[in-house]
Amino acid sequence: MKRTQNINQETFRKSWRSYRLAPVALAISAVFMLAGCEKTDETVSLYQNADDCSAANPSKSAECTTAYNTALQEAAKTAPKYATREDCVAEFGESQCTQAPAQAGMVPTSSSSSETTAAAPQQSGSMWMPLMAGYMMGRMMGGGASQPLFTSKAPNSPANGKFVDATGKNFGSATTGRTMTVPRTAMAPKPAVTNTITRGGFGESVAKQSSMQRSAATSSKTSTRSMGG
């Protein structure tokens, strides 16, 4: 009888160990799944211009120039556009604006959005846009994809002293020569802007994007703490 009890107890202990190991195995699987998701992020470097990039990558000057020129072209297409220089300067500051270059199909159209104004067709170069303040470049071995970055010197702008993209997404301090990790979606082409935006409209976009980024970061930290017990 005693021997039977010992056998039953041993069987129970093995079953209990298996039960306790199951959550551990699930947790390990979750970690590997998260690691797989992180591969969707991309490491990028921030530069002011092609010379800045070439100085940091002497053997890649051609790639630096190509990426810079690509970013300039993207900036011309995707930067916020303003009907007057004054509207642009109000958001980005003095010496931060330029006339938008002539572009195929760039004819302002009416929009129901509160951030845009219905503009009559204008002649080439009559709209204003912020100057490209820098650009974000992906790993050169991956083709050197790039995205233009803008910054504001207007004291009241949410983009003051920050690098933001054409959608208003914030990439931190407007300091070049640094490297950071961003979602791959940050390097995706942005839609061309064919409407003029009202004064303060882009600043609102930056504020909204920053709020969303803070909420996402808070949610991520909360989830991490929950997984950690």
UniProtKB/Swiss-Prot annotation:
Q: Please give the superkingdom of this protein's source.
A: Bacteria
Which residues lie within the region annotated Disordered? 101-125, 190-229
- Please note every region of biased composition (Low complexity): 109-120, 214-229
Kindly give the InterPro entries that the UniProt entry links to this protein. Answer: Biofilm_formation_YgiB (IPR009576)
> Would you identify the family this protein belongs to, as annotated?
Belongs to the UPF0441 family.
Name by which UniProt lists this protein: UPF0441 protein YE3666
Question: Which species expresses this protein natively?
Answer: Yersinia enterocolitica serotype O:8 / biotype 1B (strain NCTC 13174 / 8081)
